[in-house]
Amino acid sequence: RFDEVCKKLDFNVFKVFRDRQITNTLLSDSGDVRVLKSRNISDDGKKIINLSDYDSYINYEALKGLAVFEYLDRDDVYLTPNMTYKPRVMRKPKNCVVNGSLAILIPKKDIVPTDKQMEFFSTQEYREFYQIARNYQTRSLNVDACSVFFYGLLREKGKKSPITEKFIEEDNNVQPTIFEYMK
């Protein structure tokens, strides 16, 4: 089953950013900029959920000094929750940022995932695949530079071999190739 899902996906299409600077001391229940968290994304990844006593905001001046500020007005990146076996992906709305419970997926090329591709991340089929890809881990399920490899985009037509992509880091970070298909 794992290999069958692999054949349906193109891997290694996103880079990932996770905020580690926004802490609860910077947040309030009102303010200039909305801070999205994992529970704000619906289970199907199609909408932002407003939750009383959960939603948070940050002062614009405090936000300007943080790395996540770069993504404030971007809607060409995508959001996915950390620490879950229920992945889902949605386009990031403009005028908001995220805390560390959400990862920002940044397309490596001029990729714009279709609705169908984003919906696939919320399917039971993908979620079972993701559990195997993450080796049924229970402690560290953060979306990081290695695990983002498995956020593959659904293909029109399946591949002959399950995983043919290489993991190559372009920023001169020494990162070995994880997979290489042997012919």
Q: What positions do the PLM features span?
A:
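Polybasic, glycine- and aromatic-enriched phosphate-binding surface used to engage nucleic acids
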Residues: 2-183
